[in-house]
Amino acid sequence: MKLLPSVVLKLLLAAVLSALVTGESLEQLRRGLAAGTSNPDPSTGSTDQLLRLGGGRDRKVRDLQEADLDLLRVTLSSKPQALATPSKEEHGKRKKKGKGLGKKRDPCLRKYKDFCIHGECKYVKELRAPSCICHPGYHGERCHGLSLPVENRLYTYDHTTILAVVAVVLSSVCLLVIVGLLMFRYHRRGGYDVENEEKVKLGMTNSH
């Protein structure tokens, strides 16, 4: 029973102390809030500035987007045919490409370019193989063989005999001409000598 009043006194003292502490802490908090409102922190000010700048940039971006949309609307309304032309061009290109695919290239221009040695290459579609048109004087699958001319013996014999006959005739004609010239000269000289002898005889008779 004697312990009860001491315990009660201690509890009362603890309550009073706690009340004092809580009151002081509340006053400090009020002072801090008052000081914050009168002198704001620079960090809070910088955050406010950043928020304002961010809001301004968002507005600029929105304005640019709206301007781009207006330009697109104007172009679509003013030039509706400009967008239709590329599709036509693409359609024409596709047609050209389709035509080019239908044509097959000649294999003689690439694959069998050097197939024919002395001739012209020609690809046969039915046989699916190349063939050669040889130049004159060549033969073979690839025009690789040289064909030598075959002489006809009868033709050569006739040719040589004709040449021999012509040579004999020409030589005989030449001989006849030479003999005729010699005979003509001899007869002419003989007549000249006779005339000289007659003149000499006449001169001698006149002198007597």
From Swiss-Prot:
- Enumerate the UniProt keywords alphabetically: Cell membrane, Disulfide bond, EGF-like domain, Glycoprotein, Growth factor, Heparin-binding, Membrane, Receptor, Secreted, Signal, Transmembrane, Transmembrane helix
Q: Where is this region: Toxin-binding domain?
A: 136-148
Q: Does the keyword Glycoprotein apply?
A: yes
Cysteines engaged in disulfide bonds, as pairs? 108-121, 116-132, 134-143
Q: Which residues form the propeptide?
A: 20-62, 149-208
* Annotated region (Disordered), positions in chain: 34-55, 81-104
**Polar residues bias: start-end ranges:** 36-49
Could you describe the subunit structure of this protein?
Answer: Interacts with EGFR and ERBB4. Interacts with FBLN1.
Reported function: Growth factor that mediates its effects via EGFR, ERBB2 and ERBB4. Required for normal cardiac valve formation and normal heart function. Promotes smooth muscle cell proliferation. May be involved in macrophage-mediated cellular proliferation. It is mitogenic for fibroblasts, but not endothelial cells. It is able to bind EGF receptor/EGFR with higher affinity than EGF itself and is a far more potent mitogen for smooth muscle cells than EGF. Also acts as a diphtheria toxin receptor.
- In Swiss-Prot or TrEMBL terms, this protein is called Proheparin-binding EGF-like growth factor
Organism listed in the record: Chlorocebus aethiops
Gene for this chain: HBEGF
